[in-house]
A protein has these predicted regions:
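Non-catalytic cap/lid and distal C-terminal segments of serine-dependent acyl enzymes
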Residues: 1-260
């Protein structure tokens, strides 16, 4: 069952659209509510409808019994900017579950039933928010995540003339500030969690071997997680930074959430 909701967000100071897939009467045996729920964050330049209709989300939801909630990411990298009255991280990580649980009581409110994931920019946001709200999310799935957004401050050789530096400066406050930030910098956030004996939610990550945008960063991040002794299935397979690759990996991501 596919639903499109419109609700007022206090964190964003405006109305927002929320797309929801419920594993109910889709031609498969339907689980009994409350449903386990995956909050899934789109990547840069994508929106919720692209995620819902270009990837087999409805099929995966029906097969796994997991509801899927997708907001629009709006190229925000899920960062908070209270000075602009726009707190995209607070919305996606905290307010979105609160809104959907209130409007749809069929969604489970238990931590062990609540997951977060995303693609590219959304993968970065999912990891950041899983660390920021460890009492809310129990598992994380990251598809080709932009885990080192500071890498985007530099112009990419395969994208000549295209620089994301101005956007990253606006969102992250510049590379120096990002590097020192204990929330935006995922390595610092993980080190802080470990130092304070807080759990790093179990995570699954994948990236295509032909992904020149975030592939090297994903390899470095995986090595960092190994160094910190954080278990994380990391799937490297043929593919680029595109919907074709993510389509092929989505079932594995849901299997991880399902505990298989």
């Amino acid at each position: 069952m596919y639903l499109k909701l419109t609700a007022k967000s206090d964190a964003l100071m405006r109305a927002v659209d929320i797309h929801v897939i419920l594993p109910y009467h889709d031609g498969y045996e339907s689980p009994e509510p409350p449903y386990r729920t995956l909050y899934f964050l789109p990547g840069y330049s994508a929106n919720a409808e692209e995620i819902i209709f270009s990837l087999p989300m409805r099929q995966m939801s029906a097969l796994s019994g997991i509801a899927v909630v997708v907001p629009d990411g709006e190229n925000s990298f899920y960062t908070d900017h209270p000075e602009r009255l726009t707190c995209s991280g607070t919305f996606a990580g905290e307010e979105l579950p609160a809104i959907t649980r209130k409007l749809l009581p069929c969604l489970s409110s238990r931590r062990e039933d609540t997951f977060i994931g995303g693609i590219s920019m959304g993968g970065y946001g999912a990891m950041m928010l899983a660390l920021r709200y460890p009492d809310l999310y129990s598992r994380t799935v990251l598809l080709s995540p932009a885990v080192e957004p500071d890498d985007l401050f530099a112009e990419k050789p395969d994208l000549p003339g295209v620089s994301m530096a101005p956007l990253m400066d606006a969102l992250m406050g510049g590379q120096e500030k990002y590097t020192a930030d204990p929330v935006l910098n995922l390595r610092r956030a993980i080190e802080s969690a470990l130092a304070e004996s807080r759990e790093v939610p179990p995570l699954w990550m994948c990236c295509g071997t032909e992904d020149t945008l975030v592939g090297a960063a994903c390899d470095r991040f995986s090595a960092f997680l190994d160094e910190k002794k954080i278990p994380h299935p990391y799937v490297r397979g043929r593919g680029g930074h595109d919907l074709i690759y993510w389509d092929e990996r989505l079932e594995e991501a849901f299997r991880f959430l399902f505990g298989q």
